[in-house]
Amino acid sequence: MTNEFLHFEKISRQTWQSLHRKTTPPLTEEELESIKSFNDQISLQDVTDIYLPLAHLIQIYKRTKEDLAFSKGIFLQRESKSQPFIIGVSGSVAVGKSTTSRLLQILLSRTFTDATVELVTTDGFLYPNQTLIEQGILNRKGFPESYNMEALLNFLDRIKNGQDVDIPVYSHEVYDIVPEEKQSVKAADFVIVEGINVFQNPQNDRLYITDFFDFSIYVDAGVDDIESWYLDRFLKMLSLAQNDPDSYYYRFTQMPIGEVEAFAHQVWTSINLTNLQNYIEPTRNRAEVILHKSKNHEIDEIYLKK
């Protein structure tokens, strides 16, 4: 065990699944298929073994937060305001953050009676491509400086205080912010915030994004496995873009497959791997729970902060 994990309890999949009584997953195989990222793999068995115990743990954290807020209200002699329970989900590109987040959204809405759950990705807080070009950092897209961190912090602050917020929308198909399009985010019972940068510090070191989170999850895997999943996803995006000239990936459908593979590998090495090693993975120990995935996408180990 490295020093990084000294304050985590390592739990095997077998032990973890025994921490929650066996119940039927509150979704169908078809629903699960519809929410998973198209290069990801997940089964109803994973839902039962990993995600139902995780939802139960989140319930414990939520109850603890509410008890503390109530006690603070008594101490301050005023009524405590209800606040959204905010969950941060981080991890590398192509590791399966989106699948985890969408699955949690369904599980929380169905295991908590009448609960409302909003899901936000931090892609919407990337600067538009034109801004990145003007600043000379288009090749740094995805790195910390390519995000409008002030806007992200402002969003979290307003949501935490029970305000509804409109945020920009990012499209992976056009590889840019969609002009004039907004996502209306309600101050729901749960707000899941997913992105590679959600545990990172903005330029203002006095305020941390993680300060806004009531629970946090890091989806982890070996670097070689993530690279393989990224390259697989890149090539699968081409099949979706074949008849869509507006897609960012369309131009690659006109290139020899060898050139496409070389380009994707170069992007992984120069951008995604560098970003992972320098900025994403170093924030891993800020999570409450680390879900480690094996080569076949199956979660084999769970690390719970002590």
Curated annotation (Swiss-Prot):
ATP binds at G91, S92, V93, A94, V95, G96, K97, S98. Its EC number is 2.7.1.33. Pfam families: PRK. InterPro entries: P-loop_NTPase, PanK, PRK/URK. It catalyses: (R)-pantothenate + ATP = (R)-4'-phosphopantothenate + ADP + H(+). GO terms for cellular component: cytoplasm. The keyword Transferase applies. It is found in: Cytoplasm. It is an enzyme of class 2 (transferase). One of its GO terms (molecular function) is pantothenate kinase activity. GO terms for biological process: coenzyme A biosynthetic process. Gene3D superfamilies: P-loop containing nucleotide triphosphate hydrolases (3.40.50.300). Pathway: Cofactor biosynthesis; coenzyme A biosynthesis; CoA from (R)-pantothenate: step 1/5. Keywords: ATP-binding, Coenzyme A biosynthesis, Cytoplasm, Kinase, Nucleotide-binding, Transferase. The keyword Nucleotide-binding applies. Belongs to the prokaryotic pantothenate kinase family. This is Pantothenate kinase. The gene is coaA.
